Amino acid sequence: MSESIKVRAQRQAHCKDCSLSGLCLPLSLNMQDMDALDDIVKRGRPLKKGETLFRQGDTFSSVFAVRSGALRTFSVTDGGEEQITGFHLPSELVGLSGMDTEMYPVTAQALETTSVCEIPFERLDELSVLLPQLRRQLMRIMSREIRDDQQMMLLLSKKTADERIATFLINLSARFSARGFSANQFRLPMSRNEIGNYLGLAVETVSRVFTRFQQNGLLEAEGKEVRILDSIGLCALAGGAMDA
């Protein structure tokens, strides 16, 4: 990976001891199979905010599971403009989209101090042949990525600014809840500008919508801290929110 962070193997953490194992690749694996997966996982020092895990155009070699913190992925257009393609929370995999062309089509960058597990794809592929449950979990993850892409297309083509941001917040709420955090009170790892870029909205529009949501009693927001006051109302506004 050019100018990227190489994650070197350290054995200070194990899949079987990780609180996220029920959401990540080890889902449904028994202890012996989990040990086999753990043997190929590499763990290294945390990424600092703004550090790059891999860059658009780098040779595809590994997928990465977020252990703590958060990443954003983005592509750069021919005109040099960044387009954010996703935000990735603990237990979520990053890098699978490079499998087809054997190059990463996006850049992955830390939004805050972030730890990841590196999983060399060749070894993961070999192991998945031996462990059908691991192969099925990989297929589930890829299926979810396809579903998320389809939902994002619908979000950008059909919904108003209020609906887009409501859907975004409900989706984040569900993802935080699945990880054992509060569904109604959380800190956004991304900026308003990054939310706008992702949702196809101007940052001024994002700020106005947050203000309107507060005036309507849907939530409280101070900086990146968000407290949802009316989850039912927010879900209704989303008009069929995305699943976690």
Curated annotation (Swiss-Prot):
Domain annotation HTH crp-type: ranges: 159-232
Any one GO CC term of the record: cytosol
DNA-binding region(s), residue ranges: 192-211
Keywords, comma-separated and alphabetical: Activator, DNA-binding, Iron, Transcription, Transcription regulation
A single GO molecular function term of this UniProt record: DNA binding
Transmembrane segments: none
Gene3D superfamilies in alphabetical order: Jelly Rolls, Winged helix-like DNA-binding domain superfamily/Winged helix DNA-binding domain
PROSITE patterns listed in its UniProt record: CNMP_BINDING_3, HTH_CRP_1, HTH_CRP_2
Further information: Possesses 4 cysteines which may bind a metal ion (possibly iron).
PANTHER family: CRP FAMILY TRANSCRIPTIONAL REGULATORY PROTEIN, FUMARATE AND NITRATE REDUCTION REGULATORY PROTEIN
Role of this protein: Transcriptional regulator of arginine deiminase.
Protein name: Transcriptional activator protein FnrA
Organism encoding this protein: Stutzerimonas stutzeri (Pseudomonas stutzeri)
Top-level taxonomy: Bacteria, Pseudomonadati, Pseudomonadota, Gammaproteobacteria, Pseudomonadales
